[in-house]
Amino acid sequence: MSKSENLYSAARELIPGGVNSPVRAFTGVGGTPLFIEKADGAYLYDVDGKAYIDYVGSWGPMVLGHNHPAIRNAVIEAAERGLSFGAPTEMEVKMAELVTNLVPTMDMVRMVNSGTEATMSAIRLARGFTGRDKIIKFEGCYHGHADCLLVKAGSGALTLGQPNSPGVPADFAKHTLTCTYNDLTSVRAAFEQYPQEIACIIVEPVAGNMNCVPPLPEFLPGLRALCDEFGALLIIDEVMTGFRVALAGAQDYYGVVPDLTCLGKIIGGGMPVGAFGGRRDVMDALAPTGPVYQAGTLSGNPIAMAAGFACLNEVAQPGIHETLDELTTRLAEGLCEAAQEAGIPLVVNHVGGMFGIFFTDAETVTCYQDVMACDVERFKRFFHLMLEEGVYLAPSAFEAGFMSVAHSEEDINNTIDAARRVFAKL
């Protein structure tokens, strides 16, 4: 047995499923998950000494690559001053100033510890500010594991939520309305059915949890218009897309102004950080200045703030996002070309430093139904054959891939060459 196999066997006796987040268990592709020893640049190194070109990037945060010296040094320096104070620090102010400067729609920002905390808190704030209970989310969009967001979508334009996790009361989930991503008709139907009851829409501007599905040109502006028409708030969940699709996020890339924005992943530089913010009048409703409660023992942790501050300063340097886009485009085009040569039907969506691989006969993938029609079994075989080639992709057909500026042209070429060999076996 490999060391990863031995560790996984031991972990399953001590940790549910052997992992601390379900997708890591390889249940989406089968087999034994890799246990990682270290990472540097664009590479992961497992406990058995094998190296992999990494396109997971810790599920998004590692836009600069692993073990970036500026972030590492910032963490070391901060740790020497103490690990946690439970009191305000200068770095929290500097971090808030940097974030609000980089994302102009955020007049104010509150730091939290994860993307889930950010979305959960933003939705509570929207409900408190509007005095309404219902929210709209979209099929295939994931916003963390808060109860109100763990809702299954059925067929049809509008579904009154049924929870898709035990432990979520149906009476609570009923306030979550699920609409079809990239379909404004379904959203209007929800508003017309509940014109005075919907507090907010929450949306991934690029859906990254049904692989990678960009918005149609009219979709995000249409959501903004519907929120304005019916008096609801628009929450854009930029946990994945923030500072990656563009410096000011997908909202800037697509030209839409939200009322609230949720951030995570890159904002922490690899440390556990989330944030939410937006219009000053809405944020003023948050405790301690307003009645909507939110708190966190480790929110604004000094080490996490130092890591995030260092990361964002690097990400803000000229040329970063152009490089991300060029590398991702080169990878996407190369994979499609290699698949076509092998007679394999393939679509690769990509926006900025995000991409998604779909085995499908369709020409485009634009919604949840398109994603679910893809060949998941072929993806599983592709994943494992690429792993044997030393390429680590997301271990699920429903998760986006992530590029970093640490990836080189040689890494991209080697990945395409590996895919060409793998396609010949599919």
From Swiss-Prot:
Belongs to the class-III pyridoxal-phosphate-dependent aminotransferase family. HemL subfamily. Homodimer. InterPro entries: 4pyrrol_synth_GluAld_NH2Trfase, Aminotrans_3, Aminotrans_3_PPA_site, PyrdxlP-dep_Trfase, PyrdxlP-dep_Trfase_major, PyrdxlP-dep_Trfase_small. Pathway: Porphyrin-containing compound metabolism; protoporphyrin-IX biosynthesis; 5-aminolevulinate from L-glutamyl-tRNA(Glu): step 2/2. NCBIfam families: hemL, PRK00062.1. GO terms for biological process: protoporphyrinogen IX biosynthetic process. It comes from Salmonella paratyphi A (strain AKU_12601). The modification N6-(pyridoxal phosphate)lysine is found at K265. Keywords: Cytoplasm, Isomerase, Porphyrin biosynthesis, Pyridoxal phosphate. Its EC number is 5.4.3.8. Its cofactor is pyridoxal 5'-phosphate. GO terms for cellular component: cytoplasm. It catalyses: (S)-4-amino-5-oxopentanoate = 5-aminolevulinate. The gene is hemL. Its main location: cytoplasm. This is Glutamate-1-semialdehyde 2,1-aminomutase.
